[in-house]
Swiss-Prot record:
Any Pfam family matching the protein: zf-C4
Tissue expression remark: Expressed in the adrenal gland with main expression in the zona fasciculata and medulla (at protein level). Expressed in aortic endothelial cells, with high expression in the descending thoracic aorta and the outer curvature of the aortic arch, where pulsatory shear stress exists, but very low in the inner curvature of the aortic arch, where oscillatory shear stress prevails (at protein level).
Alphabetical GO biological process terms: axon regeneration; camera-type eye development; cardiac muscle cell proliferation; cell differentiation; cellular response to insulin stimulus; embryo implantation; female pregnancy; gene expression
Zinc finger (NR C4-type): 140-160, 176-200
Region (Hinge): 206-229
Annotated region described as Disordered, given as residue ranges: 1-61, 79-109, 211-233
Residue intervals of the NR LBD domain: 232-463
The family this protein is said to belong to: Belongs to the nuclear hormone receptor family. NR2 subfamily.
UniProt name for this protein: Retinoic acid receptor RXR-alpha
Organism encoding this protein: Rattus norvegicus
Segments of skewed composition (Polar residues): 83-109
Annotated function: Receptor for retinoic acid that acts as a transcription factor. Forms homo- or heterodimers with retinoic acid receptors (RARs) and binds to target response elements in response to their ligands, all-trans or 9-cis retinoic acid, to regulate gene expression in various biological processes. The RAR/RXR heterodimers bind to the retinoic acid response elements (RARE) composed of tandem 5'-AGGTCA-3' sites known as DR1-DR5 to regulate transcription. The high affinity ligand for retinoid X receptors (RXRs) is 9-cis retinoic acid.
Biased composition (Low complexity): 32-55
Length: 467
């Protein structure tokens, strides 16, 4: 016969035997006398060596430290001595006389505890049984309403719990209009705040428990602030913003140098975009070197990351720069490319995607330069780039940018809890648009009718570095 099914029974009897058996190994207390529902199966001596061969008996289980088995066999609702204490010195009426009073008709849900005068008839013991202990846990010790658990040391309802917490936290003072002996029950608990608070104290509610709860909340908030600040120290958003601002003057220089040019340049939009991209690739390298920890990576890895992300990095930049432009984009050279020109040049579909999925979304949420810089840093630290010597290191840097950006959003825009997620949702669109733009550039390079300068040509001739 397979004995595995009997392991739980053997284990429980073994645990009970250690508590119930006498030094001679014979059971000094029969299990049926403890609880009739357990049946006669546990009435035999429990010290027989045949029951000690189960492998589970050698394990250190928490149940071995439970002591006598009474807590296991009796009601799980707690110790037998649990009852609602009385405080006659304060003039509060206890449960039973209150139930007997003709002025307080009871509902069916409250008519559970028998009047004290019926103890002899119903054979209610002097000390409450396990069932009575269970009952006291289901009622509020202050007003007799249904208890929601133990609060500040006493089983109480949500109403009395909240009342006591507010009183302690706000350090409120009450006055009784009568003789400081008002009846506090479910129906009248709100009539006298003074007597209700005094009864909370009399029943055992602890002021210090409320204060400790508040301190725990403060400590938790301080820990969160410390964790966010430590993340920001590893990848400070201030440095990321500095990197964005450092390349901005060069963009403005391009704009000033081209102020005399007619915005509708004789060159087609694709040529203008390619020329702007070639110039921006130089500033992109300078930007990347200013991003924290990028220059600490092996030089080969730096090159791989820039080759893998240059197109998305440039698209993110000119999209954010174009927030103030209507139906067009502003290039770093200072030229505007209108959507009509893009459609005429045959790149209208991808141009419209840039406007709707990037420029418009950035405008709607008023994305600032710090957030733009963090998104670009996330693109830069791409652990999926092929050929990296240590992808895990790059992934760790990306995670630090995530943490710093999230902390920045919570601090700068506390009224927008979903802002961090909205920012990250721009990344898939940026990736998709970047790949489509690469397809167009490869096509223009292939047919050869669009002048592509040296740096951009080098980027296009290198194999695409992402998986």
């Amino acid at each position: 016969m397979d004995t595995k099914h009997f392991l739980p029974l053997d284990f429980s009897t073994q645990v009970n035997s250690s508590s119930l058996s006498s030094p001679t190994g014979r059971g000094s207390m029969a299990a049926p006398s403890l609880h009739p529902s357990l049946g006669p199966g546990l009435g035999s001596p429990l010290g027989s060596p045949g029951q000690l061969h189960s492998p589970i008996s050698t394990l250190s289980s928490p149940i071995n430290g439970m002591g006598p088995p009474f807590s296991v066999i009796s009601s799980p609702m707690g110790p037998h001595s649990m009852s609602v204490p009385t405080t006659p010195t304060l003039g509060f009426e206890t449960g039973s006389p209150q139930l007997n009073s003709p002025m307080n008709p009871v509902s069916s849900s409250e008519d559970i505890k028998p009047p004290l005068g019926l103890n002899g008839v119903l054979k209610v013991p002097a000390h409450p049984s396990g069932n009575m202990s269970s009952f006291t846990k289901h009622i509020c010790a202050i007003c007799g309403d249904r208890s929601s658990g133990k609060h500040y040391g006493v089983y109480s309802c949500e109403g009395c719990k909240g009342f006591f917490k507010r009183t302690v936290r706000k350090d409120l003072t009450y006055t009784c209009r009568d003789n400081k002996d008002c009846l506090i029950d479910k129906r009248q608990r709100n009539r006298c705040q003074y007597c209700r608070y005094q009864k909370c104290l009399a029943m055992g509610m602890k002021r210090e428990a409320v204060q400790e709860e508040r301190q725990r909340g403060k400590d938790r908030n301080e820990n969160e602030v410390e964790s966010t600040s430590s993340a920001n120290e590893d990848m400070p958003v201030e440095k990321i913003l500095e990197a964005e601002l450092a390349v901005e003057p060069k963009t403005e220089t391009y704009v000033e140098a081209n102020m005399g040019l007619n915005p509708s340049s004789p060159n087609d939009p694709v040529t203008n975009i390619c020329q702007a991209a070639d110039k921006q690739l130089f500033t992109l390298v300078e930007w990347a070197k200013r991003i924290p920890h990028f220059s600490e990576l092996p030089l080969d890895d730096q090159v791989i990351l820039l080759r893998a992300g240059w197109n998305e990095l440039l698209i993110a930049s000119f999209s954010h720069r174009s927030i103030a432009v209507k139906d067009g984009i502003l290039l770093a050279t200072g030229l505007h490319v209108h959507r009509n020109s893009a459609h005429s040049a045959g790149v209208g579909a991808i141009f419209d995607r840039v406007l709707t999925e990037l420029v418009s979304k950035m405008r709607d949420m008023q994305m600032d330069k710090t957030e733009l810089g963090c998104l670009r840093a996330i693109v830069l630290f791409n652990p999926d780039s092929k050929g990296l010597s240590n992808p895990a290191e790059v992934e760790a840097l990306r995670e630090k940018v995530y943490a710093s950006l999230e902390a920045y959003c919570k601090h700068k825009y506390p009224e927008q809890p979903g802002r961090f997620a909205k920012l990250l949702l721009r990344l898939p669109a940026l990736r998709s648009i970047g790949l489509k733009c690469l397809e167009h550039l490869f096509f223009f390079k292939l047919i050869g009718d669009t002048p592509i300068d040296t740096f951009l040509m080098e980027m296009l001739e290198a194999p695409h570095q992402t998986t």
